[in-house]
Amino acid sequence: MRKTLPVLLLTLLFVASSAAQTFKVFHSFNFADGSSPNGDLLRDSAGNFYGTTQFGGSSNRGIVFELDAKGNETVLYTFTGGTDGGIPIGRVMRDSAGNLYGITSLGGDPTCGCGTVYKLTKSGTLKVLHSFKGGKDGAQNEAQPELGLVMVSGELYGPASFGGVSGCDGNLGCGVLFKVTQSGKETVLHRFTGQAEGAFPQDLISDQAGNIYGATGGSYMQGNAGTLFKLDTTGKLTTLYTFPGGAHGYSPRWRLLRNANGVFYGVTQFGGNTSNCAVASAGCGVVFAVDAAGKEQVLHTFGKTRGGEEPSGGLLDVAGNFYGATFYGGTVNSNCKFGCGVVYIVSASGKYSVLHRFTGGTDGALPSGSLTGDASDNLYGATIAGGNGNGVIYEITP
């Protein structure tokens, strides 16, 4: 059932040290229409946005939503947590017919409840394409909100953060890469071992030739700080770069950017500076570039409380500058013990500045997911907290 709900629109103006940016709350969730939005927003050519919330709705198992260009919301589907799945994670993708595809971390197979791959038609009918069994075919987990699908020749490719080969961090399984057809047939393309090739695969990207690229988050038990990999059209996996940890970053997360020269840009959740961090021993994270020869350059090291820590989404490239958000850091107050998070910009040469520091009030707190841009260079993102207590979608004009 589709429900159209009014938007709460709040505008806040602030002045940064170098220039004035405009920040406004595009939509504030109220639990009935969703709670804790996560993952990247998808924008269509008409200016509508699509996304998911992990919680909220009538069953508190999350929803799929649409926001129009003015921020008015339509609930497209409410998950029950049963065989239809629940607690959706990551971004949705949309095909040319207007169907949406995504992943849930709960529900599906009643003996496991390990999540699903779903298709939501334009008319609002949800079809479960695959229910994970939790063994060799993989399993999803709500602690991994950064996952998503890519479509190549009409077939869906994605990561399962757990399952597959056992032996990684509490025997959760090291994760798999899979393919699901429109008819619902799943094929496991690769099972990670947690050793030199890494474990816990993250969000994926593809190139025009159909090759798949991504990162593994690393395994504490295996002593692996994460990798970048390529899966070619024959199913062969090649490790392109292995993170050494420390100052170079630990646990690359979220979707990568890859330019025409084969240079990857991304973020690590940990590593880098270990002072003034919410998880001090792990580090506050870095922004990195890895060239086609496998050489890494650290563009920015997070660490100062006011500057943000623990990147909470991938990078958005706008005219050679990279925009992103951090989960912690920024403004520390009674709402946010480790800081409410920030939106930042970093240039290709490493110049860094903060565009907005969340306060934990009506402007939101704890941003999650990558930013999405429009034709006017406005940026849109989500926070899992703040607003009415259920998170917000925000708009910022750099």
Positions of predicted regions on the chain:
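Extracellular beta-propeller repeat domains
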Residues: 2-398
